């Protein structure tokens, strides 16, 4: 476990005279442009694990403040199979398994992945513009727009901050100060009615239909793209207008060869304004101090694990 990296460090402490301007440009394009970017060629095959973690942490200084990714306060997450999907529960976070991850966003302004090892087969990364999905549904099924902007209960997947309920309300479509922020998390909507039937109403037929229409629209080849990312590739995504997924994968047999990614959840200080109801999940809406699973905003008290761990205390 690494805890020595400074939470007060700035770009001046990690100078990158050539790469730094490119990192800033990619982040700007993610925040106010196309919403995603890919950087290729980091020499992770010859770096040690600690070197990879330090380099990736250095990238974060150019992109935003790190946020806790689970109740163990991981600031750099390890996306790797640590739970056999045949034994996984409905509340297990899918990034810990080899099962396909449906279209979703992460609980941060920006999310980044650094690819250390790829799977034997599968594990494709998919991206789609949630703004394009919205426009297409508005064109073809305008009756579903009020449904998507209505009340949606989401499960916390057993990561419940003190004083909070195991579920919360967050609309899919959120208009605020000139921005349309779209929060989409398939599989998180279906759980609360099943787990808390006395508190959470079942999904309506209109909501069920809206989920299916969203899935079908996002998966259209003229709307989504799929990429086979290689070791040393870094992706950066804006969660407010890009949804992403991952196909199921078959992993290598040897433990040293298994699919392994590092992940950052980031909150830039110049991020867009968000409505107050995001606070229930994000712990606040102040840019630079929001996001994560709601236990604490900001990097203070966080840790940098060297290897994948089960991030949920209760699986």
Language-model regions, residue ranges each:
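Active-site environment of non-heme Fe oxygenases that use a 2-His-1-carboxylate facial triad
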Residues: 1-19, 24-25, 32, 37, ...
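"Short basic amphipathic alpha-helical interaction patches in structured regions
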Residues: 50-57, 127-129
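A short alpha->loop->secondary-structure connector
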Residues: 56-66
């Amino acid at each position: 476990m690494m805890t020595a990296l400074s939470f007060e460090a700035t770009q001046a402490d990690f100078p990158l005279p050539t790469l730094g301007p490119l990192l800033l440009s990619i982040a700007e394009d993610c925040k106010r442009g196309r919403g995603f970017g890919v950087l290729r060629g980091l020499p992770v095959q010859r770096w040690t694990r600690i070197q990879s973690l330090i380099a990736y942490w250095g990238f974060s200084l150019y992109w935003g403040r790190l946020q806790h990714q689970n109740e163990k306060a991981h600031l750099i997450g390890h996306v790797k199979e640590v739970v056999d999907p045949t034994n996984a529960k409905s509340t297990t976070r899918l990034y810990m398994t080899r099962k396909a991850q449906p279209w979703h966003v992460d609980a941060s302004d920006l999310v980044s992945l650094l690819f250390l090892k790829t799977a034997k087969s599968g594990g494709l990364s998919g991206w789609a513009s949630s703004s394009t999905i919205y426009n297409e549904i508005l064109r073809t099924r305008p009756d579903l727009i009020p449904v998507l902007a209505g009340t949606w209960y989401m499960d916390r997947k057993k990561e419940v901050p003190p004083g909070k309920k195991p579920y919360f309300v967050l609309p899919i479509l959120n208009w605020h100060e000139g921005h349309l922020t779209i929060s989409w998390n398939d599989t998180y909507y279906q759980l609360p009615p099943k787990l808390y039937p006395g508190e959470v109403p079942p999904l309506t037929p209109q909501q069920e239909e809206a989920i299916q229409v969203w899935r079908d629209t996002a998966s259209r080849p003229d709307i989504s793209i799929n990429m086979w990312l290689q070791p040393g590739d870094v992706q950066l995504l804006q969660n407010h207008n890009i949804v992403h997924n991952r196909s199921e994968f078959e992993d290598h047999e040897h433990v040293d060869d298994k699919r392994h990614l590092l992940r950052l959840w980031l909150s830039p200080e110049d991020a867009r304004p968000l409505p107050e109801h995001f606070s229930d999940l994000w712990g606040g809406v102040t840019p630079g101090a929001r996001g994560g699973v709601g236990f604490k905003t900001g990097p203070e008290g966080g840790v940098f694990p060297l290897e994948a761990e089960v991030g949920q205390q209760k699986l």
